[in-house]
Amino acid sequence: MATMNRRQFLIRGGATLAGAAVALPFADTLLAAGRTNSAAHHTAAGTGFPGSLLDELSAIVADLETKFPYATARFIATGGVSISRDRKGKRVSESGSPTLGVSIRIFDGASFHETAVGSASPQALHAAAAALKRTTPRAADRYRIERLPYLQQTWRTVMERDPAALPLADRAALLDQEFARCNWDDPRVRSVRVSTDIVETQRVFVDRTRRLASVSTMLSHTGFMFGFDKGKPGFGFRRHVGQAGLELAHLNDADIEKLRKDFVESLSTEPVPAGEYEVVFAPEVSGLLAHESFGHGVEMDQFVKDRAKSREFLNKPVASKLVTLLDDPSVAGARGSYAFDDEGATSQPTIIIKDGIFVQPLTDLMSATFLGTPRTPNGRTQSWDRKVYARMSNTFFARGTSDPKELLASLKDGLYLEGFRNGIEDPQGWGIQFTAGTAREVKGGKFTGRIFAPPTITGYVPEILGNITMVGNDFVLEPGSCGKGYKEFVAVTSGGPHLRTKAKVS
């Protein structure tokens, strides 16, 4: 079977339990089955599952397509372990609730229909598929589904230190040592916590031309400090997140120093005087702008519902000519990366804005089909029992040519914003609001020592992007989670270089 190495982030291979506490059932079977075209059924030892899940799902798809023009099946299972250590002791628990299920989807010629089963039992899957087939009439053909080229492939996260190779007790002991390094006897500190969360996700997608499987390991390692000074709360926070192994599960001396420094500085922040400022965004704030401005606003399911003003600006200027913005699920090891989306499209970069021109929205299969546009690998779901939507992955501004020090030196009277908290956008009106961690006062290109928190930026998307006058040559991605409105959460990153612009801050 052919191998695929997408920026060295995923490789073909078998699966091992990343969490060491929650056994996901079919990893070895899935990846082994993905290496052959054989339709022969077999029993996977130790799973109680009779035969290849890939073969079962392929048979279901083939049967549904005797009536409908297009059918798919996707399997998702997640499980993991969380270890934490604070001043009260140590805790080991499941990381979230283990989940497992299959979604079966059909296109009747005019619209999509779907059913989901919280099981991988062949009997349950075939029964659900039969009911969907029986109760859904075949419609007249109004749209044509794009068939992707044939591909049968498996992937697995690249790791330098596989968590499965280190017993859970040894990992807990390492966390004890790190807690001792992070703990601080400053009387203002009330709580210190370090934690490691590891989640393994198995994913399968099957349609007539695709049999895809992946096993990914997501690790999040966090240090947190909280306390008070004269009634004012303060905190420090450092974390390493990505699709990787235990090589990420470590805070170095610089991380711990930054954790303590951020805690101390947060105790002396003041509210920012509201006004319009010349500003420089640190990469994580640039990413928040990217995510909220030309992330949600160009998810193309909003075009179908006529809920996105960006639809009026396709192939038109929306930003400074210095701005190029991308979404790329193939970035090596990033939290928002994946080998293929939940509709079988393999990962590749999508240029959303090029030299200030809005050139391509993010699509799922439904929006691309109904609007007749090029398809991007952005059809994503939160879990096996949720709908697929057009979603971001890793969304960021491309590097520019300016040294970040030049951006700061150019500020005669302004703010340097860093850290991020949250954001929201109105796709219909194209208003945006997001909150950074802190804003440092800058005069004459130098910090004055005044720190404001939390600064909130508001404005009209094309105006903020159009005001960008300098783009740094650095690049950083920050991990996060993204909801579709108030629900449908998926893993993402956002970032880019430093940016200089003008914005309303309060």
Please give the residue ranges for each predicted region.
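N-terminal small-residue-enriched
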Residues: 2-6, 10-506
